[in-house]
Regions:
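Active-site-proximal helix-loop-helix substrate-binding element of RNase H-like nuclease domains
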Residues: 154-182, 303, 343-487, 497, ...
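Active-site palm subdomain of RNA-directed nucleic acid polymerases
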Residues: 485-497, 501, 821, 825-846, ...
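Conserved catalytic core of nucleic-acid polymerases
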Residues: 453-456, 510, 566, 622-623, ...
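C-terminal polymerase-core module
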Residues: 529-536, 540-592, 759-807, 811, ...
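Non-catalytic, usually N-terminal nucleic-acid engagement modules in DNA/RNA processing proteins
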Residues: 1-59, 65-70
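Function-dense linear segments that define catalytic or interfacial modules
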Residues: 344-348, 419-422, 426-449, 466-473, ...
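Extended two-metal-dependent nuclease catalytic cores across DNA- and RNA-processing enzymes
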Residues: 2, 22-26, 75-254
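Conserved "right-hand" nucleotidyltransferase catalytic core of DNA-directed polymerases
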Residues: 231, 235-359, 450-647, 666, ...
Length: 894
């Protein structure tokens, strides 16, 4: 078999990848989707072809001989998107780092370079594959030159291959004749005029018959069809120019030797650094069999399973000695239904896997882990997702609270989240890549779909790697993460908010919230009855029964049978999304019923029926509170999501009635009043807004007076309602369109409201504009506590993406600060309840609201604790107000 050369049309493949891969950015906000897609295509062809040589050709921005010959050449092309343009030099740099030859030549296009290299190489007996999305290159096909055109559909890349026979089968002409076909038909993408009115089929038919333009010109009188005859006859010089522009040159004067473009050594230290920089996580695995990172054989060498009791004792004793000082240990805990094994890293050469076995029982491991934790107070224990394992260290308690210092731990997952809150994962594999420049096999790669219990018996070697790698990664990256947090001024956020919060959330999960099962059943029945009534009313209005939950069937009923306006039909049918139906609802009662039917059906399936599966044997729901999910810093809840309970509709509110305190207790519910507006007043420094809050004015009435220019006592309810919508809309970067939808007014009126608002509060306008400009400059926003949110969209050339980024830039500092403040309040309340040795417990947080299950004889004390803890969480230029209520169920307390 002869030698092989792959030639790649750089701009063509990069452009194709840019539009075929969703927008991606790295931590610095650099767009990377085109590079990522390019590399995927590159690796596909490298795997298939296994070439001896590889070269990539790029166009230069300088004019070529074609531009000089024809001023209009490519004159209709739109400018390259900035996000793509940014990636062109980066792609070249990356290719060079991979030791792939990159060729450019002033005055010529990449096609000419590819043609020249291909023909010269083929003449030497080298088999050439040209990879491009440009069919112009079909003219280069011969027995030794294959044109490969990749096409990506639904994420799957398929390749069309063309030798001369394939070109003939498609167009009925030879590759050389294909130039003449293009000269006749022209090319709108390159602004090559051709013969006006002559399309691909006619051009192909003419060249099939006459085989060359010269022969066509000699037989003008007999050309068919008549329109083509006229056009060609009248545009001979233009057609000749089009042929000149269409023909790829194969004699470009370039300094190139195919022998210097050998394929190999793609995965080296230089390319690794760039792959890591651009966050090409999946591709980093390609470096595993190199000397650059492999799988860190040095640490693998020191992985050791120990089950001898005396040896285990020695490891724990040494761990206590280290944890009691200032050095760190790495700790990974493996547990599904029960504790299975522990990974402990004491140093670079002491990495242990300790399974539950023989005398090393589950309770023994828990006791010894508690011993280690009890002596640590300098964030000596590096681990991840500590909240999931705190119950293991509960050997000693006071009033139900574990005697574990939060300063014992550094949670590497939470620390990494603060640095990059938009990342998908913060596991050991991600930490290794991000902070250690190491690529580790993932848990899935090591264990597949095996449970831990099965892995103990069926894949213990890989289980040992998984457990040891985890503890080793936590141990190795802890100091580096700490250093980065300090460099980014986020360590205080980590130290004073996120780490203490772990213990608060753990206690909330342990406590759970009690559910009145009978009330839940009754609620489900009420919903079921209402849904049945609505169902009948909808069928009656429609004149037939149909599946209301089927968008396709519903669309036909609404827009065809009932003839409602503005129905937009797609391939799958009419859109029946909520925003479409909400516009129809005021004029069509049946649509209002459909919207209500949907809302009640969701309430029934998600809450009335769905909550039952989460009720534990103790009659309580023990949900999970997450610290590393939202980009804004807000806590999220899952299994179930109690933060998403709808409260705008009465039946949605009613679900809160099923949540009840235990006997002898009541609920105290405290909710911050307008916290985000108060934060806006503080951060913007707007004197009018600050004065309004400091004088305890009705802020929405005060805003209405300012915006509408009326005395405070003459503000109407409608003006107040509109001002309220503007107040909150400003925080969320609401546009005039959004406000018009919210208030059911015209966009013009909404625009006037916003303009009046900013005219009344110019400092707020300046502040918000500053947030946007800062985010554009830095690529991220910051809260008062230096919580960072990356906003790559804000630099997008796409209007919709850029507008989204600007709205995020306006809102994230305010919403993120509110999230930080409620977290501080939670810590305050938790600590005060603990210090007062009370039986009352903080059990739930929903956005700006805290719920405490309060012993009846502790109500007054807890009320004061909640008010103090929330009001004094932070000192602002305006007071923080808290609405506090008491109730025998959550609805009554809210």
């Amino acid at each position: 078999m002869g030698e092989k050369l792959i030639l790649i049309d750089g701009h063509s493949i990069l452009n194709r990848a840019f539009y075929g891969v969703p927008d991606l950015t790295n931590a610095e906000g650099i767009h990377t989707n085109a590079m990522y897609g390019f590399l995927n295509i590159l690796f596909k062809f490298l795997d298939e072809e296994k070439p001896d040589y590889i070269t990539v050709a790029f166009d230069l921005s300088a004019p070529t001989f074609r531009h000089k010959a024809f001023d209009g050449y490519k004159g209709t092309r739109k400018p390259m998107q900035p996000e793509l343009k940014q990636q062109v030099p980066l792609m070249k740099e990356l290719l060079k780092a991979m030791n792939i030859t990159v060729v450019e030549q002033e005055g010529y296009e990449a096609d000419d370079i590819l043609g020249t290299i291909a023909k010269e190489s083929a003449a030497k007996g080298i088999d050439v594959s040209i990879v491009s999305g440009d069919r112009d290159l079909l003219q280069l096909a011969d027995e030794h030159i294959k044109i490969r055109i990749p096409k990506t559909k639904k994420g799957v890349t398929e390749v069309e291959d063309y030798y001369p026979s394939d070109v003939f089968n498609l167009y009925g002409v030879t590759p050389h004749e294909f130039i003449d076909v293009k000269a006749l038909m022209g090319d709108t993408s390159d602004n090559i005029p051709g013969a006006p009115g002559v399309g691909p089929k006619t051009a192909s038919a003419i060249i099939q018959k006459y085989h060359s333009l010269d022969n066509v010109f000699e037989h003008l009188c007999e050309l068919k069809p008549p329109k083509a005859k006229t056009s060609i006859t009248e545009n001979i010089e233009q057609i000749k120019m089009s042929r000149f522009l269409s023909e790829i040159k194969i004699n470009v004067p370039i300094d190139y030797k195919v022998e210097d473009s050998k394929a190999g050594d793609f995965f080296n230290e230089n390319s690794y650094e760039l792959f890591k920089k651009y966050n090409f996580k999946n591709m980093l695995k390609k470096f595993e069999n190199t000397d650059i990172i492999a799988k860190d054989p040095e640490c693998y060498e020191y992985f050791k399973k120990i089950s001898d009791f005396a040896e285990v004792e020695n490891v724990f004793n040494k761990a206590m000695d280290i944890a009691g000082g200032i050095e760190k240990i790495g700790l990974s805990i493996v547990r599904e239904s029960e504790l299975t094994a522990v990974g402990i890293t004491l140093s670079d050469t002491e990495i242990y896997y300790i399974p539950v076995s023989g005398f090393v029982t589950e309770s023994y491991l828990a006791d010894r882990l508690s011993d280690v934790v009890s002596v640590a107070s300098n964030r000596n224990i590096a681990s991840a997702n500590i909240k999931d394992y705190l119950d293991i260290f509960e050997k000693d308690k006071i009033n139900g609270y574990p005697l574990v210092s939060e300063k014992a731990f550094i949670d590497t997952a939470i620390a990494a989240y603060l640095l990059h809150p938009s990342n998908e994962s913060y596991d050991y594999e991600s930490l290794g890549r991000e902070f250690l420049s190491l690529t580790y096999p993932s848990k899935t790669e090591l264990l597949g779909k095996l449970s831990i219990k099965k892995a103990v018996n069926e894949a213990e070697d890989n289980l040992i790697k998984y457990v040891c790698l985890s503890s080793y990664a936590y141990y190795k990256c802890a100091d580096k993460i700490t250093e980065q947090l300090k460099n980014e001024n986020m360590y205080e956020l980590f130290e004073t908010i996120e780490m203490p919060l772990i213990f608060v959330l753990f206690e909330m999960q342990q406590q759970g919230i009690s559910v009145d099962k009978q009330a839940l059943v009754d609620y489900s029945k009420v919903l079921g009855t209402k849904i049945s009534v609505l169902e009948k009313e909808i069928y009656e209005a429609a004149g037939e029964e149909f599946n209301i939950n089927s968008p396709k069937q519903l669309g036909v009923i609404l827009f065809e049978k009932l003839g409602m306006p503005n129905g937009k039909k797609t391939k799958s049918g009419y859109s029946t999304a909520a925003d479409v139906l909400e516009k129809l609802a005021p004029d069509y009662p049946v649509v209002s019923k459909i919207l209500e039917y949907r809302q009640l059906s969701k309430l029934k399936s998600t809450y009335a029926d769905g909550l039952t599966q989460y009720i534990s044997e103790d009659g309580r729901i023990h949900g999970t509170f997450n610290q590393t999910i939202t980009a804004t810093g807000r806590i999220s809840s899952t299994e179930p999501n109690l933060q998403n309970i709808p409260i705008r509709m009465e039946m949605g509110k009613a679900i809160r009635k099923v949540f009840v305190p235990k006997n002898g207790f009541v609920f105290l519910d405290a909710d911050y009043s307008q916290i985000e507006l108060r934060i806006l007043a503080h951060m913007s420094g707007d004197e009018k807004l600050i004065e309004a809050y400091n004088s305890s004015a009705d802020i929405h009435r005060a805003t209405a007076a300012q915006v509408f220019g009326v005395p405070l006592d003459e503000v109407t309810d409608e003006q107040r309602r509109n001002a309220k919508a503007v107040n909150f809309g400003i925080i969320y970067g609401m546009s005039s369109f959004g406000l018009s939808q919210d208030l059911s007014i015209s966009r013009k009126e909404a625009k006037e409201y916003i303009e009046r608002y900013f005219a009344s509060y110019p400092t707020i306008k300046t502040f918000i504009d500053g947030l946007v400009s800062d985010a554009k400059e830095k690529g991220y926003s910051l809260t008062m506590y230096n919580r960072r949110r990356e906003i790559p969209e804000i630099k997008s050339s796409n209007f919709m993406q850029r507008s989204f980024g600007e709205r995020v830039a306006m809102n994230a500092p305010i919403q993120g600060t509110a999230a930080d403040i409620i977290k501080l309040a939670m810590i305050n309340v938790y600590n005060a309840l603990k210090e007062h040795n009370l039986r009352s417990r903080l059990i739930l947080q929903v956005h700006d609201e805290l719920l405490v299950e309060t012993a009846e004889d502790e109500v007054e004390t807890v009320k004061q604790i909640m008010l103090d803890g929330m009001k004094n969480a932070v000192s602002l230029k305006v007071p923080l107000e808290v609405d506090l209520k008491e109730g025998k169920d959550w609805l009554e307390a809210h």
